[in-house]
């Protein structure tokens, strides 16, 4: 009975756990082994019971005890069978619970992008393409906008005649001090008066000297006139630099030239006739002095033919060469 009570306690305490089920199965196997062992003992005890009946009544006590033991043992066997029958329905729902575990619910799927974003599926590449298209459109619009007013301005512009840049008005600068034209020292008037009184002879030295002096005087007069005109015009207006005024150098005192003693003029007959100069300068207006022939040189002179440089002795003796030539052919 103690064994049965322990089995009951173990079964009651182990319900609903895997370890209790394993222990219960082990106990059930041991109980089945024991139950199978009891009929073997009963069969083995029946043979001596027949022999004991034949021997005598003294021996009848043993078989009774033997019959009681299987009867006593039989009762726990029926109890074990009852336990098995009662335990089996309890263990089955525990196994079913372990097998039929509720599956884990999958996480809810993320919401679609089309529901949240109004523009739908967009990526970085699409954004870059859109930005580049917008930039191209803006640059093209700007170019068209700049080209239209440029063409209108070119059509409206009229070619103006070229005007030379007028000189800007300059400040009136103080006129520079006018330098007096330095005239060459005039010769003493006495010899000039004498030259005017004397008649000019074309073949004389005085005429040649006068002809040489005339162009010099004419050039001197022309230079004076040019200087006077420049002085009247005044110096050109130039931007004057502010600074110290120029220091005027003291002029050197003009020293009168010493009069050279003039050679005594010889009478015309005593002089050797000298040919007048073939050409002379004539002073004309504008300073142009072409060559002019003298009145005497109206007819062109004939140049002397070339004369061989022969000695006069050879000319006087024309037969001298002939004699020499004749002498060459001697034997």
Curated annotation (Swiss-Prot):
Organism domain of life: Eukaryota
Biased composition (Basic residues): 320-331
Outcome of mutating residue 150 to A: Affecting excitation/contraction coupling in muscle fibers; the sensitivity of CACNA1S voltage sensor is shifted to higher depolarizing voltages in cells carrying this variant
Main location: membrane
GO terms, biological process: skeletal muscle contraction
Region entry Mediates interaction with CACNA1S, spans: 3-76
Record's keyword terms, sorted: Endoplasmic reticulum, Membrane, Sarcoplasmic reticulum
Stretches with biased composition (Basic and acidic residues): 21-35, 61-71, 222-242, 250-302
Function of the protein: Involved in skeletal muscle excitation/contraction coupling (EC), probably acting as a regulator of the voltage-sensitive calcium channel CACNA1S. EC is a physiological process whereby an electrical signal (depolarization of the plasma membrane) is converted into a chemical signal, a calcium gradient, by the opening of ryanodine receptor calcium release channels. May regulate CACNA1S membrane targeting and activity.
Subunit record text: Interacts with CACNA1S, CACNB1 and calsequestrin.
PANTHER family reported in the protein's UniProt record: JUNCTIONAL SARCOPLASMIC RETICULUM PROTEIN 1
Name by which UniProt lists this protein: Junctional sarcoplasmic reticulum protein 1
The species this protein was found in: Homo sapiens (Human)
């Amino acid at each position: 009975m103690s064994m049965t009570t322990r089995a009951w306690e173990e079964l009651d305490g182990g319900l609903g756990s895997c370890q209790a089920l394993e222990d219960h199965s082990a106990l059930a196997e041991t109980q089945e082994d024991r139950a199978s062992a009891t009929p073997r003992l009963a069969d083995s005890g029946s043979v001596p019971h027949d022999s004991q009946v034949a021997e005598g009544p003294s021996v009848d006590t043993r078989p009774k005890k033997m019959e009681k033991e299987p009867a006593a043992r039989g009762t726990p066997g029926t109890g074990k069978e009852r336990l098995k029958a009662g335990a089996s329905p309890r263990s089955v729902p525990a196994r079913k619970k372990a097998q039929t575990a509720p599956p884990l619910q999958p996480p809810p799927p993320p919401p679609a992008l089309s529901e949240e974003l109004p523009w739908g599926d967009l990526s970085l590449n699409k954004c870059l393409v859109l930005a580049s298209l917008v930039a191209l459109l803006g640059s093209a619009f700007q170019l068209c906008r700049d080209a239209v007013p440029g063409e209108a301005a070119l059509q409206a512009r009229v070619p103006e005649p070229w005007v030379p840049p007028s000189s800007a008005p300059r400040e009136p600068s103080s006129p520079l001090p006018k330098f007096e034209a330095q005239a060459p020292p005039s010769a003493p008037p006495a010899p000039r008066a004498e030259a005017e009184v004397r008649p000019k002879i074309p073949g004389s030295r005085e005429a040649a000297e006068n002809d040489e002096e005339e162009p010099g005087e004419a050039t001197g007069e022309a230079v004076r006139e040019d200087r006077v005109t420049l002085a009247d015009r005044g110096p050109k207006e130039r931007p004057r630099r502010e600074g110290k005024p120029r220091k005027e150098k003291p002029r050197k005192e003009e020293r009168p030239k010493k009069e050279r003693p003039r050679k005594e003029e010889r009478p015309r007959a005593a002089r050797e006739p000298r040919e007048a100069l073939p050409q002379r300068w004539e002073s004309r207006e504008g300073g142009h002095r072409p060559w002019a022939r003298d009145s005497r040189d109206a007819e062109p002179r004939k140049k002397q033919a070339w004369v061989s440089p022969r000695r006069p002795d050879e000319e006087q003796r024309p037969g001298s060469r002939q004699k020499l030539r004749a002498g060459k052919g001697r034997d």
